[in-house]
Amino acid sequence: MFGLGGQPQLSSQQKIAAAEAELDLVTDMFNKLVSNCHRKCIDMNYNEGDLNKNESNCLDRCVAKYFETNVKVGENMQQLGQNFSPGKF
């Protein structure tokens, strides 16, 4: 609790700020995913109301790669954070 090596207690305001920051990151990632995969996979001349098979397959692969990359980057960042200590340079 008080300096016993545990996690510091966050105030309600800090928790709200952290949740808002996380929501902003998730929203930004989603918007980038939609923009990038749409630009890559969907022809700008809309001829049909539905996706064709090639567009659908491309979107599936694009989204899967985007999430896979996001997971790998997160794992690497977490590992870097664990390897870093104040006395280590």
Curated annotation (Swiss-Prot):
Keywords: Chaperone, Disulfide bond, Membrane, Metal-binding, Mitochondrion, Mitochondrion inner membrane, Protein transport, Translocation, Transport, Zinc
GO BP terms: protein insertion into mitochondrial inner membrane
InterPro entries, per database record: Tim10-like (IPR004217), Tim10-like_dom_sf (IPR035427)
Keyword Zinc: yes
Family per record: Belongs to the small Tim family.
Subunit structure: Heterohexamer; composed of 3 copies of TIM9 and 3 copies of TIM10, named soluble 70 kDa complex. Associates directly with the TIM22 complex, whose core is composed of TIM22 and TIM54. Interacts with the transmembrane regions of multi-pass transmembrane proteins in transit.
Entry-linked PANTHER family: MITOCHONDRIAL IMPORT INNER MEMBRANE TRANSLOCASE SUBUNIT TIM10
Protein name: Mitochondrial import inner membrane translocase subunit TIM10
Lineage, highest ranks first: Eukaryota, Fungi, Dikarya, Ascomycota, Saccharomycotina
